[in-house]
């Protein structure tokens, strides 16, 4: 058979995989499923997503003496670019320097797939002994780069009369394209998040990595988590409609906790669980039940426009699932005028990483942020870096920078205390408001730095951090792949036109856990942006390929990302102010990816509006993206029911 393999089903039929299947679970699923009073099953086709970064793929290669090469690239992973360029040029890594000042957006699309353009530029620069820039036009960029993995998933669930889940089986099937890229880790994360915030009872989760004749799909914000998490919400909706109970009641009834269970299907204890508190607070502050009553009455009296309401949780694991990537380095210099330069391994792509890193350094030295310069990410300053991905940028690099700063403040404190004849009190020295203080003695920071220089104290230090507590055994399917979980909840209200399938998102209320926020303005911006991007994935962003596997939604005219008019009329984001119980940087939490999945509440609200046509007895089949066409088809199916 030489016909192209473009779908999960056709790849499964051909047993075409890019990587081996993985599975894990707990309990006796067959027995619990057989004993369950009620059973339900379902399938869901989940679309991919184009990254649509503002700046496309671009690299500049400049040859230097002795076979050295300088690379300026738009990449989330400078060390991988360095490694691959060195392989292409057949030189050692120390001959290649990669400089990354900032990207015009990345979202995962420049984690691995930026490297090939740097390699092409470097090869041509080496052969022709001149600088070469390789930049892709937007349409070419869309054709040749990988997307978010499309998935086609299946579930079966057994539950009791109250809606308590007793047994779950899930098949998580990722369309990986023609090569593995990061698909192993992406399908793993989809499996790790197939429970979302719910205890699934006895469970068995299988993850297939399917090979198809498409571009090699790659990382995208959430990294498989959204494609797994949406299955948990589809499952909950199915249970709720089967029992004719409000979905929020079923959601709260199955949250991890003492009355259900606290261990995930992969054997990790859910500690410091904030979801019950977050959901109850949003339920109250968002007036869920009053609005549910009003919407039910509205739908009863409105023949064409139907409203939907949904409150959904997010529980997202923070750490790279590949353990070795959970490390970071930093290099901090203090100059004799008291100014400070910070180098670290993270990359800035508009998410505010350098701003937070600058704040951390300023706080450690007791200085204003204008005394801190965060440099470009360079492989000759901090080597062997991990990609800026998995929401880990601040967690890893912030801790590494803090480690270097503590080394330097310790040296300066010892120098200051010794100069006062109080060497035994060096641990009492404080760095505050541009001054160094010990008891009644105080000296401006810049003066102490100058004095330390004359005392031959080193004013440069490297820092390092590795995330603790991580382990996972693929053979047994058990471990702790995440340092902690970030939590959140979203309450969305929508209106659909049952004649056309068109809809509006009328109101969104979000309560999200970022620990003790390093920068509330940045964190709120990340939550808002992630939500809108997630909403686009679930509603308007429709990737289409022809029968030969060629992308035909290849430009901004045929591929619709959310516009300003798609922003909810009422859009309220609140931070849940609770310190991270784990020892993260200043007890903050990662914020890059978790809010993306808050947008699942919009998809659930659309289904809720459609379900009203059946008296809330039907869980409509609504594959993603839920375009107006798909919504209309679901409406017609509900009306026919």
Where are these regions (language model features)?
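Amphipathic, heptad-repeat alpha-helical segments used for oligomerization and assembly
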Residues: 223, 388, 392, 582-594
């Amino acid at each position: 058979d030489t016909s192209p393999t473009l779908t999960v089903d056709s790849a499964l039929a051909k047993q075409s995989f890019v990587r081996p299947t993985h599975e894990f679970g707990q309990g006796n699923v067959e027995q619990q499923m057989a004993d369950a009073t009620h059973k339900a099953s379902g399938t869901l086709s989940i679309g991919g997503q184009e990254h649509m970064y503002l700046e496309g793929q671009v690299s500049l290669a400049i040859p230097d003496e002795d076979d050295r090469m300088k690379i300026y690239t738009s990449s989330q992973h400078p060390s991988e670019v360095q490694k691959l360029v060195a392989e292409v040029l057949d030189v050692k890594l120390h001959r290649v320097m990669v400089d990354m000042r900032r990207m015009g957006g990345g979202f995962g699309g420049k984690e691995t797939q930026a490297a090939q353009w740097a390699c092409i530029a470097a090869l041509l620069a080496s052969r022709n002994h001149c600088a070469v820039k390789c930049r892709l036009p937007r349409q070419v960029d869309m054709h040749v780069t990988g997307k978010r993995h499309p998935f086609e998933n299946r579930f079966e669930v057994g539950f009791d009369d109250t809606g308590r889940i007793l047994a779950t089986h899930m098949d998580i099937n990722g369309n990986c394209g023609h090569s593995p890229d990061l698909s192993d880790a992406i399908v793993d994360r989809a499996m790790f998040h197939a429970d979302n915030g719910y205890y699934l009872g006895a469970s068995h989760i299988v993850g297939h990595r399917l090979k198809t004749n498409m571009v090699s799909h790659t990382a995208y914000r959430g990294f498989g988590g959204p494609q797994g998490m949406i299955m948990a919400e589809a499952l909950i909706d199915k249970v709720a409609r089967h029992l004719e109970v409000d979905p929020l009641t079923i959601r709260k009834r199955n949250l991890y906790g003492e009355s259900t269970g606290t261990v995930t299907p992969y054997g990790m204890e859910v500690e410091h669980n904030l979801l019950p508190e977050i959901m109850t607070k949003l339920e109250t502050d968002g007036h869920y039940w009053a609005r549910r009553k009003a919407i039910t009455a509205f739908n009863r009296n409105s023949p064409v426009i139907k409203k939907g309401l949904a409150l959904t949780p997010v529980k997202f694991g923070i750490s790279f699932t590949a353990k070795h990537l959970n490390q970071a380095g930093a290099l901090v210099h203090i100059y004799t005028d008291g100014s400070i330069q910070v180098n670290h391994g993270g990359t800035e792509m508009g998410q505010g990483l350098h701003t937070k890193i600058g704040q951390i350094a300023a706080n450690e030295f007791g200085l204003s942020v204008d005394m801190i310069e965060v440099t470009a990410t360079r492989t000759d300053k901090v080597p062997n870096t991990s990609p800026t991905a998995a929401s880990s940028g601040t967690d890893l690099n912030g801790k590494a920078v803090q480690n270097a700063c503590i080394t330097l403040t310790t040296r300066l404190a010892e120098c200051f205390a010794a100069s006062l004849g109080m060497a035994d009190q060096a641990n009492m020295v404080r760095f505050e408001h541009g001054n160094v203080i010990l008891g009644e003695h105080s000296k401006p920071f810049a003066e102490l730095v100058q004095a330390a220089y004359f005392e031959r104290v080193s004013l440069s230090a490297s820092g390092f951090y590795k995330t603790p507590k991580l382990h996972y055994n693929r053979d047994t399917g058990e471990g702790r792949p995440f340092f902690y979980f970030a939590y959140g909840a979203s309450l969305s209200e929508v209106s659909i036109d049952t004649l056309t399938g068109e809809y509006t998102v009328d109101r969104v209320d979000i309560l999200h856990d970022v620990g003790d926020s390093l920068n509330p303005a940045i964190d709120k911006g990340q939550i808002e942006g992630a939500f809108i991007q997630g909403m686009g994935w679930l509603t308007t962003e429709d990737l289409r390929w022809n029968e030969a596997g060629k992308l035909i939604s290849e430009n901004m005219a045929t591929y619709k990302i959310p516009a300003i008019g798609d922003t909810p009329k009422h859009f309220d984001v609140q931070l849940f102010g609770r310190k991270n119980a784990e020892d993260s940087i200043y007890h903050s939490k990662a914020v890059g990816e978790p809010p993306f999945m808050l947008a699942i509440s919009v998809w659930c609200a659309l289904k809720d509006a459609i379900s009203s046509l059946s008296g809330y007895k039907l869980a409509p089949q609504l594959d993603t993206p839920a375009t107006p066409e798909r919504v209309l088809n679901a409406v017609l199916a509900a009306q026919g029911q």
